[in-house]
Amino acid sequence: MTRKTPIERYRNIGISAHIDAGKTTTTERILFYTGVNYKLGEVHEGTATMDWMEQEQERGITITSAATTAFWKGMAGNYPEHRINIIDTPGHVDFTIEVERSMRVLDGAVMVYDSVGGVQPQSETVWRQANKYKVPRIAFVNKMDRVGADFFRVQRQIGERMKGVAVPVQIPIGAEDHFQGVVDLVKMKAIVWDDISQGLHFEYRDIPDELLATARTWRDKMIEAAAEASEPLLEKYLAGEALSEDEIRQGIRQRTVANEIVPMLCGSAFKNKGVQALLDAIIDYLPSPVDVPAILGHTEDDKTAERHPGDNEPFSALAFKVMTDPFVGQLIFFRVYSGVVKTGDTVYIPGKTRKERLGRLLQMHANVRQEIKEVHAGDIAAAVGLKDVTTGDTLCDPDKVIMLERMVFPEPVISQAVEPKTQADQEKMGVALHRLAQEDPSFRVQTDEESGQTIISGMGELHLEILVDRMKREFGVDATVGKPQVAYRETIKQAVKDVEGKFIKQSGGRGQYGHAVLNVEPQPPGKGYEFVDAIKGGVVPREYIPAVDKGIQDALTAGVLASYPVVDVKATLVFGSSHDVDSNENAFRMAGAIAFREALRRARPILLEPMMAVEVEMPEDFMGHVMGDLSTRRGMIQGMEDIAGGGGKLVRAEVPLSEMFGYSTTLRSLTQGRATYTMEFKHYTEAPADVSEAIIRGKGMGRQ
């Protein structure tokens, strides 16, 4: 089956923004005007099509990137039909992972800004992610009808805060209650939308006299930006010749695709103004799959290879999202970079070194699905029937294997114990957690070997709260969540010699006799436990020596200060004695444990706490507040640097994990939400005396 739309007319775009900038409403309007959705969905009524999880509608925030397809022929019917694949992305910082994974598979992005709030924290994070994946973008300043709306302030903020070159291709006509429409600077015409038809009808008018001078000023700036795209355009511009509308669009497109400028538009999605012009700009200025560089990967013999976006190339695709659907089970969303794949085809998954057969292929409109028989280069689709695929996996032709660059996901920064309320919940919880971890690579599940508890880890308090909530709603699992916990360790500071351990019971019948003498000394950090047999003359029979080692390992599981595991010690068995009848393995195991615990008490035991490498990215103005706060958390500043591309400052510090709980909330309020941070385990270090004493008291332990 041949493709219906040539690949040059595809646009794979994401719609990204800070929470509450009106991103979901903008997407809804796009679906309405492209004819997919006939009744407008409103987020504040809880009916928006893209926000399809129950929780998203309740909270009014977008959690999951839903993918949908729309077709557009231009607001004046002046284009051949284009196919626009849209990925809606969340704007809450705990869901940054969703934005990151969609950026990886996009060719272009629409950044939605609130005309009053302007460039907000998540906008900066999303901008950095778009820079990382070199995604060309256009800006849509939304909510122009709000009190305090200021299009030009947002234009300045994009330059000041994100060092982006924002080039208005429209300016607003009026603002707040008087917002009527926009001036199209390319055509030099006013566009006014009609309220009665929900913005379906519009007309071109002459620019109001009071705006003419402003429009000319901004048009000159736009033409200058367009002219810098190529030598011929620049020569024409410098010679004082007028550039045609097509030449202006061509120049702006070239520079947008090259990530040199960001065209700016405005409107009010809620009031149905400006969205069709935004659709035209997506076609005019954002790239098709053939306008961006070929995707790179590695062959089986680890040579670099590339795949070009064409149907005649070998099939290659990237799975960018795994979801559990209540009707069809697991859905794998994937972006096809090259080739064609049909229902029933076998694909190879290089990361898992296995083949799988594609079941049904679906194209999604939010959570409404349409079954299709094949997908082509440039398409985004969902597959049913792939068993062992996780987010970030490559799917490819089994005969032409390529492994596309994997997505890198941040390590989780918060952990909590989770316990099922009933035995029935216990079995279901295992299945639920496995499913959720498959869907979300930033969510981890592990079992604490010491307590046997299930520990869940994620990107923030809201992240874990929503996942626990999903366990209840989607899998019927009731669970209680504990407070965040820190894994402390114990070790020793000095060496001790000739510490004796005896386990002797000899009162009638067969007795017990074990006797071991140990030297115990500290090891360098990270060296772990070491056992040395230094017995001479057979005073401890050979067959009992492994039992002494086993007894010491038993004692390692709980130290003498607060029952935390003991690390980095060396134990040498130097002497002992045995009894011909009463000695056995168990007696020597007990003797080894007794000697070792006594050695720990004498060897200046200390508590170790985990230190985290923390990196905070923020605008420079907040650096003093952030560094002051890190110091109060016993943090040690390791360094500072400018973020490449003028995106503020990066502070690196080492901070004890115990001081980092609740940090996301504090950081948000310290920086008006304009900072982001990452945290990963670095090493263990000695806890200060006051901290140790508090922990020991908290565990109800004195020195044993």
UniProtKB/Swiss-Prot annotation:
Keyword annotations: Cytoplasm, Elongation factor, GTP-binding, Nucleotide-binding, Protein biosynthesis
Family to which this protein belongs: Belongs to the TRAFAC class translation factor GTPase superfamily. Classic translation factor GTPase family. EF-G/EF-2 subfamily.
Limits of the tr-type G domain: 8-290
Binding site for GTP: 17-24, 88-92, 142-145
Organism: Polaromonas sp. (strain JS666 / ATCC BAA-500)
GO CC list: cytoplasm
Major localisation: cytoplasm
Domain of life of the native organism: Bacteria
Biological process annotations from GO: ribosome disassembly
Pfam family, one: EFG_C
Subcellular localization: Cytoplasm
GO terms of molecular function: GTP binding; GTPase activity; guanosine tetraphosphate binding; translation elongation factor activity
HAMAP family to which the protein is assigned, alphabetical: EF_G_EF_2_B (MF_00054_B)
Physiological role: Catalyzes the GTP-dependent ribosomal translocation step during translation elongation. During this step, the ribosome changes from the pre-translocational (PRE) to the post-translocational (POST) state as the newly formed A-site-bound peptidyl-tRNA and P-site-bound deacylated tRNA move to the P and E sites, respectively. Catalyzes the coordinated movement of the two tRNA molecules, the mRNA and conformational changes in the ribosome.
CDD domains linked to this entry: EF-G, EFG_III, EFG_mtEFG1_IV, EFG_mtEFG_C, EFG_mtEFG_II
Glycoprotein recorded as keyword: no
Coiled coil: none
Protein name: Elongation factor G 2
